[in-house]
Regions:
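Intrinsically disordered, metal-sensing/regulatory segments
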Residues: 1-266
């Protein structure tokens, strides 16, 4: 797919694809004019896609790269836990600071809780987006085959990232202009991080790519399980629908992963 291409041309293709995917994902929830129940079902779909990407793409790719790089069995596990704990720490601090500022009667208000959830999800996914940029630069430096797989994988979970974040923001009463600024900033993080990482790829050519992959996996795990799943089941009357949609999202990504695996194998 990328044979004999200049690395910076490949990078431009990555940036163009990721920006296009991100813009579509950002505006879909707003264009569909959904009510609260439907938005929560969309978050359920995002959660399913997140979990599918986590279990069928990020985890296998992380352990495969660790094995090929000669790392020990526990090395990727430690980095995954590290990524998870970093976002957990940030989440706890942000919520603590935010709750200290609010009036007691506001803290249990649904709109207020949605605002806090959107903020912590943004922070977690922003950290993940920076790591994605580094992974893109390293993948391009490691060869065309890995770059193609990473492009498909990151495009898929970038769609899930942006769609989920945009859906969560629609649940809040934050001003549209402010949420638009947040979304534009988030969409630009990965391309900017990739561009800034490219000049140092040669310096990092012996850098173990499984490390940023593992950190990204830990962050993805936290946001998917801790932020999105609870929000997906927020409407108890739709719990069975949400469950079915989460499972459908997981199965869809599993099928895509199988197809990509077959294509990569050939």
């Amino acid at each position: 797919m990328f044979e004999d291409m200049d690395p910076y041309v490949i990078l431009l293709i990555f940036v163009a694809v990721i920006l296009a995917v991100s813009l579509v994902a950002a505006f879909l929830p707003r264009m569909m004019k959904l009510d609260m129940r439907q938005i929560h079902l969309m978050v359920a779909l995002s959660a399913g896609i997140f979990l599918g990407i986590l279990f069928f793409m990020l985890l296998p790719e992380t352990f495969e790269e660790a094995h090929e790089g000669g790392a020990g069995a526990m090395d990727p596990v430690l980095w995954i836990v590290g990524g998870f704990l970093v976002v957990l720490f940030v989440d706890v601090i942000v919520k603590r600071m935010h709750m200290n500022k609010c009036a007691c009667e506001e803290c249990d208000d649904k709109d207020h809780l949605h605002e806090v959830t959107s903020l912590t999800a943004f922070i977690g996914l922003a950290i993940h987006a920076v790591v994605d940029g580094l992974v893109i630069a390293l993948a391009i430096g490691h060869g065309e085959a890995l770059a193609a797989v990473v492009l498909v994988g990151i495009s898929l979970h970038k769609f899930a990232d942006v769609f989920a974040l945009s859906s969560i923001f629609t649940l809040t009463k934050i001003e549209k202009k402010k949420t638009l600024v947040f979304m534009i900033a988030f969409i630009l993080i990965t391309p900017v991080a990739a561009i800034l990482s490219m000049p140092v790829v040669d310096i990092l050519e012996d850098f173990a790519i499984f490390i940023p992959l593992a950190v990204a996996t830990g962050i993805f795990m936290y946001v998917g399980i801790y932020s999105l799943l609870p929000e997906a089941f927020h409407e108890r009357r739709d719990s069975l629908k949400s469950l079915a949609i989460v499972v459908a999202g997981i199965v869809a990504i599993a099928l895509i992963a199988i197809l990509l695996g077959d294509a990569h194998g050939h």
